[in-house]
């Protein structure tokens, strides 16, 4: 009922494997189909953003009548470009000048709620430690047993220690304006920065992260905890998890790293980040993928999206199809990037309390920023990651402020996984089948109306809520051009001289059967068929089939044709089918005489040559061949060749693999792909999920209710596979990305089989 409707930019369908239930099947009505529902509500556009795949694009396209589809994915994204930044802040200081190496111990990991209990620091100059600083810090609370066990610091040791503000001021006075270095500096600098903000203390020191240096310079180490790196570098033993010892170890660690950097031609801190770019892509340091929304702005963007999806499945698959930031940057033309949900890079940084400049650096890469209803992120409250709903609202306020400062639109999205609130139970069952312990936690990520979304974000103020819910989402929709997910028309590959070879085969066979001057009915039929076939560029399809059939026959395996290809005389003359589609007639195998008149005589009409009586050739006395099945060519190609040829061939099971290999030989390894298939949850499987779900929870339900729940879970993607016989061939002047993505069947990176998506 809102006068201007929003646009949903973050929506999952049944092709988000075992995770979402939103349907886009053209057969479903608005009560089930989200595209038709959005259109019925008056929405101008809707995005499709499944997890790492584009498998709902065709159905969404067919479902859309008067609504624009925005084609995209929610990618599993890894930042391999600037996530491991060694130096933060501006500095041109040479390696041999003074650096303050420090470490802190805290009451916990969350810089918003926890506090510092010890600060230790050393001054490193020209490879030597020249000064030290150490202080306990009063936490104003009792330490937990876990922190006492981990750090060895007790409550008694903190009696009389300076306050948080006093300790911070003392440490910063010791550090001055010198660069600070720490192992996992993001943690240590984050606590220092948070304390400085709280007490109004200026803090602008540049920082160096020895953890990131280790990950980049020691790519094969695998694990990079301070003690592991120290042991690898043969540094002195130390009391780990005490600030003073950890700080000294960082001090001892930097000189060998600086020596490695000098061997690379570097001389000062400001050169480090640039030199690390090519190193970030390698190494064994684990990176957890985050989420990213990628929308296609135009046809170029769609092609790049298909390419990124394909590379994620083929080259960078690690449990998920990964999109690397470096690869996205190389293929960014025509793409629109959104910051995604709570699993996105930006929201994580906001929740982690990263400083404002770092948030701006992260957000600047995106084209638009996302915020979502706080109900989407209530799990953070249940898990103790935040302490109140208001804190979740503050996260969204921070993103809005970032958008305002950077001039980027902020969009409210739903992260839709099912259509209506009552559908949530089906997702609980699916998640339970995968073993998720929190499968039953409420998460109302259904397709919300514009009014519902405006109410969700009313705490931002009426005008801002309208901007993020309506104005900005429509703006993103306007950025996207109308796109067809698959280009129209036939894109036939090339076989050298295919039209000439087809003509030679056909006329050669015609002369073999009907003599040097075939009857006019034969000539006319061949001319009509060849004219349509060559004009519509179907000659490649015919010759492909002919070569496959001939190859099989040469190896001793018969091929059976079926279907309407039997209505094509050219197919018969070229050896694709054994069915002669001419009217019933006699032909002499010896002198080539033929008789088309006998079967047309009203006194004894025959529709099929095989039914005619036996007769001998009146010219040479040889028994006639009875031929012709009287099938019009239009049955196969339509009138004027308006139907693409569908040549169905049955190859021997023993020889089928050879036929596949021969197809690769004909068209090239890079232009032939196995046809992919999608396996979905069948009703019997869904019924098993329902029974197990109810049993594990000690619940009972009527048979009708069990059936209802099972039906609600059917049709959701489980896996992918390959068609036993289907092959997809693309033209030599095209790439598969011009048509669709590709992948390994069943997401198996160990197979060399590549299928269409």
What are these regions (language model features)?
Residues 734-743:
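Glycine-rich active-site loop/lid that clamps phosphate-bearing ligands
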Residues 1-106, 110-115, 119-133, 140, ...:
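Phosphodiester-processing cores and adjacent nucleic acid-binding clamps
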């Amino acid at each position: 009922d809102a006068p201007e409707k929003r646009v949903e930019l973050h929506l999952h369908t049944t092709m988000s494997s075992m995770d979402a239930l939103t349907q886009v099947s053209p057969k479903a009505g608005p009560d089930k189909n989200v595209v038709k529902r959005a259109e019925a509500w008056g929405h101008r556009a809707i995005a499709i953003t499944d997890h790492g795949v584009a498998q709902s694009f065709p159905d969404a396209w067919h479902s859309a009548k008067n609504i624009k589809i925005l084609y995209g994915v929610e990618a599993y994204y890894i930042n391999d470009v600037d996530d491991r930044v060694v130096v933060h802040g501006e500095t041109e200081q040479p390696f041999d000048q003074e650096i303050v190496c420090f470490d802190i111990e805290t009451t916990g990991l969350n810089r918003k709620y926890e506090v510092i209990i010890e600060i230790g620091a050393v001054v490193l100059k020209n490879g030597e430690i020249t000064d030290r600083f150490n202080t306990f810090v009063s936490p104003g609370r009792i330490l937990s047993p876990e922190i006492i066990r981990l750090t060895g610091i007790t409550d008694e040791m903190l009696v009389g220690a300076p306050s948080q503000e006093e300790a911070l001021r003392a440490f910063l006075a010791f550090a001055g304006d010198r660069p600070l270095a720490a192992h996992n500096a993001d943690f240590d600098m984050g606590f220092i920065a948070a304390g400085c903000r709280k007490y109004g203390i200026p803090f602008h020191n540049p920082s160096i992260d020895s953890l990131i240096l280790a990950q980049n310079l020691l790519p094969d180490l695998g694990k990079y905890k301070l003690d592991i790196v120290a042991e690898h570098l043969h540094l002195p033993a130390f009391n780990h998890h005490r600030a003073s010892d950890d700080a000294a170890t960082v001090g001892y660690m930097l000189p060998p790293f600086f020596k490695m950097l000098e061997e690379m031609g570097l001389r000062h801190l400001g050169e480090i980040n640039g030199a690390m770019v090519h190193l970030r892509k390698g190494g064994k340091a684990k990176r957890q993928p985050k989420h990213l929304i990628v929308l296609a702005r135009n046809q170029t963007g769609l092609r790049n999206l298909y390419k990124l999806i394909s590379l994620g499945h083929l080259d960078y698959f690690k449990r998920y199809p990964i999109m690397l930031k470096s690869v996205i940057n190389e293929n960014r033309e025509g793409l629109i990037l959104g910051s995604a949900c709570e699993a996105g890079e930006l929201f994580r940084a906001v929740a982690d309390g990263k400083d404002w400049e770092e948030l701006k650096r992260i957000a600047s890469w995106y084209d638009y920023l996302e915020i979502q209803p706080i109900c989407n992120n209530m799990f953070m409250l249940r898990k103790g990651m935040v302490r109140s709903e208001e804190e979740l609202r503050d996260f969204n306020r921070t993103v809005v402020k970032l958008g305002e400062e950077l001039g980027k639109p902020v969009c409210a999205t739903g992260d839709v996984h099912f259509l209506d609130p009552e559908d949530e139970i089906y997702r609980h069952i699916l998640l339970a089948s995968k073993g998720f312990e929190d499968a039953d936690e409420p998460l109302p990520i259904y397709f919300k109306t514009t009014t519902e979304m405006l109410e969700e974000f009313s705490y931002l103020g009426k005008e801002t809520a309208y901007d993020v819910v309506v104005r900005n989402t429509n703006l993103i929709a306007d950025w996207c051009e109308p796109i067809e997910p698959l280009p129209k028309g036939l894109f036939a590959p090339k076989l050298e001289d295919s039209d000439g070879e087809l003509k030679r085969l056909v006329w050669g066979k015609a002369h073999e059967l009907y003599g040097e001057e075939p009857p006019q009915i034969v000539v006319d039929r061949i001319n009509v068929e060849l004219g349509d076939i060559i004009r519509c560029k179907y000659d490649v399809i015919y010759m492909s089939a002919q070569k496959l059939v001939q190859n099989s026959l040469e190896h001793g395996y018969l091929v059976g044709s079926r279907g309407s290809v039997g209505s094509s005389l050219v197919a018969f003359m070229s050896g694709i089918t054994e069915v002669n589609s001419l009217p019933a007639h006699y032909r002499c195998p010896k002198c080539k005489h033929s008789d088309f008149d006998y079967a047309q005589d009203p006194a004894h009409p025959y529709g099929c040559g095989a039914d005619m009586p036996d007769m001998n050739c009146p010219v040479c006395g040889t028994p006639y061949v009875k031929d012709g099945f009287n099938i019009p060519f239009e049955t196969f190609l339509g009138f004027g060749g308006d139907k693409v040829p569908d040549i169905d061939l049955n190859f021997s099971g023993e020889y089928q693999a050879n036929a596949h290999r021969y197809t690769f030989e004909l068209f090239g390894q890079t232009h032939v792909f196995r046809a992919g298939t999608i396996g979905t949850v069948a009703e019997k499987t869904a019924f098993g999920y329902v029974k197990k779900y109810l049993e594990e929870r000690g619940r009972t339900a009527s048979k009708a209710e069990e059936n209802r729940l099972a039906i609600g879970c059917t049709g959701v993607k489980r896996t992918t596979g390959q068609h036993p016989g289907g092959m997809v061939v693309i033209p030599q002047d095209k790439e598969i990305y011009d048509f669709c993505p590709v992948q390994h069947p069943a997401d198996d990176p160990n197979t060399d089989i590549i299928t269409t998506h």
